[in-house]
Amino acid sequence: SIGEELLDDWINEQRKDGFTINHSSIETTGFPFLVRIEILAPNALNSATGLSWWSEKLHLDLQPWDLKRYRLEALGAQQMRYRSPAEKGDFTANTTGIEGVAVISDSGTLTALSLVLKNVRITEADHGSLLKTNRIFADIVRPDYPPIAHTESALEISVAAEQTEVAALHAPILGDTITSIKAKVEFLGPFDGDTIF
């Protein structure tokens, strides 16, 4: 099917960047108005960077007439892990679900990504719990083509979190739980070298 072909092409592209991606069964439903690809037990590993991820189930939705917008839903338990190659940290993030929408530009690069992560718990092997939060919202936006002038936006990242407990912050003025945290960062001008997008 068109969905499985796109997925296989994407997996092969990730190999060039050092990622090994595996999964169990794949089922495609919904054609012709909406294509849903259901992937069981997907996982990804990049030994060189120390990154790994696994999920119970993944849904990828796309419309056959718009191959530049994808909806992603990771169902059930998820785990992302970063183990520093220099053995300076072993971080694990667990969540009960991820929802996202990705938009691909005319040039073939990721131009927008919106994510919602549910019930996030971040721990470090030597220090235990670092952060707990009910939800994290993240939006990443970049232009279709890299900026030329130093005043043009190259990347914009917005992050918000709800009901957050941070182990390192025990300030009485803040209380045990921070109701809402929001941050926005904008990078201006061209980037030197490769970027993750």
Locate predicted features:
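Glycine-rich, small/hydroxylated-residue low-complexity segments
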Residues: 1-197
